[in-house]
Structure formats: C-alpha cells, structure tokens
Amino acid sequence: MKVSMSLILITLSALVTIAKAYDPSPLQDFCVAIDDPKNGVFVNGKFCKDPKQAKAEDFFSSGLNQAGITNNKVQSNVTTVNVDQIPGLNTLGISLVRIDYAPYGQNPPHTHPRATEILVLVEGTLYVGFVSSNQDNNRLFAKVLNPGDVFVFPIGMIHFQVNIGKTPAVAFAGLSSQNAGVITIADIVFGSTPPINPDILAQAFQLDVNVVKDLEAKFKN
C-alpha cells in the first residue's frame, strides 16, 4: 500500500504539535486553583516588571567570593543565587549556588524537585554521588572529585557531597531552574510539621520505634 507524502507530513505535524503541548513545570511545591484572582499569585510566584523599567541591577548579584559560615550540624553552607536574589532570572530557567564545606563536612542527602545540577569543585576534595530510582534498582553513582572536576546530578535524584579532606572545600553549582527547590531527606522525614507517626517510620526504616522518636526529637523544627 502506498502512503502519500502529504499524509506523512500531516501525521508528523500532528506528532510535533502533541510533543509541544505539555504543561509547564511548577516553580513552587504546589499551586492551588482559586476563582478569585485577588487572593492569588502567578504560577511561578513572580510578577513581571515592565521591560522598559528593567535595569542592570535586575540582572546582578555580588558576594559569591565570600565563604559561607560552616559552623552548623552538617558543617557546610549553601549560598544561593536564584530569582529571589536576581529578579532578572525570572523565566530564564537557571540559578547558581556556592557551597562551602568544613573539613569532613557534608551537604547531606537531598534532592532538587525542579532542577538538574552541575557541580564544579574549585578547592579541596569531595566524595559525591546520587542514587537512581527504584526502577533502576537504586544504583549509586559516585566519584571522588578534585579541583576542576565536574559532576552532574540528574533532576529529582537524591544526591550528596562530602568533604573527605583535612582542609575546607569550595564548589559552585548551576541549576536548571530559577527556583530549584531543595528537599533534605533526613529533615523532611524526621522533622516534618506535624511529625510523621513514628510507627510508620519504624516499619519503613526497620527501626525500633524509640529510635525513631529520638530522631524526631533531634530533627524537630
């Protein structure tokens, strides 16, 4: 059976149209629909300035040359430059962070629900990695990084960085969202508000319920 070229072109055009007809990714945790716009915000949480009123300061930020304070429980600090610091990033789908690590400090297991991350190590030695999804048997992809090395953390994957050196470490990372979001696994599981029922977590993690209660007390907001 011969198929006309015009039919093929029509079919391909329809497929291309369908491929482009997807919902944009949300830039906050949720967006509850309302009928009264007076009590609402735009889906990305930002209104746009009149382009004629834009100025250079809307696309500028400073301070990433300064080390973050790492005197905390995980001994690291993340300095974020996203749409909240640079309004001109709105709708551009990109942001940046500086991460400082004390010796043996870590950026604990976490995920960015809205962004892929690409990290470059500037100073020190890091052990980094991410874990793939259940469908991929939760494989660990990990490397030791030295200055100048680059590693990518795919969107949504749980990942971490640990300073395995005796000196401070510094890294910079780009994120494919103006507001990538961050979910720190231990904090949300054991420090949610209100707390998750400890019996649920005890069964999920195969722990004694008293151990879970102790963890929830430590991570309580």
Curated annotation (Swiss-Prot):
Question: Could you tell me which Gene3D superfamilies the record lists for this protein?
Answer: Jelly Rolls
| TM annotation in the entry | none
Which InterPro entries does this one have?
Cupin_1 (IPR006045), Germin (IPR001929), Germin_Mn-BS (IPR019780), RmlC-like_jellyroll (IPR014710), RmlC_Cupin_sf (IPR011051)
> Using the chain's own numbering, where are the disulfide bonds?
C31-C48
Q: Tell me, in a sentence or two, what this protein's role is.
A: May play a role in plant defense. Probably has no oxalate oxidase activity even if the active site is conserved.
Q: What is this protein called?
A: Germin-like protein subfamily 1 member 19
> Does the record's keyword annotation contain Signal?
yes
Does the record's keyword annotation contain Membrane?
no
Q: Which residues form the signal peptide?
A: 1-21
**What does the record note on quaternary structure?**
Oligomer (believed to be a pentamer but probably hexamer).
Q: Where does Mn(2+) bind?
A: H110, H112, E117, H159
What is stated as this protein's family in its record? Belongs to the germin family.
Q: Which residues are glycosylated?
A: N77
Tell me a GO cellular component: apoplast
Sorted alphabetically, which Pfam families does this protein's record hold? Cupin_1 (PF00190)
Q: What UniProt keywords are attached to this protein's entry?
A: Apoplast, Disulfide bond, Glycoprotein, Manganese, Metal-binding, Secreted, Signal
GO MF annotations in UniProt: manganese ion binding
- UniProt organism field: Arabidopsis thaliana
Location in or out of the cell: Secreted, Extracellular space, Apoplast
Q: Mind telling me which SMART domains this protein's record contains?
A: Cupin_1
**Which CDD domains would you find in this protein's record?**
cupin_OxOx
Recorded superkingdom = Eukaryota
- Predominant place of localization: secreted
Give the Cupin type-1 domain ranges: 76-213
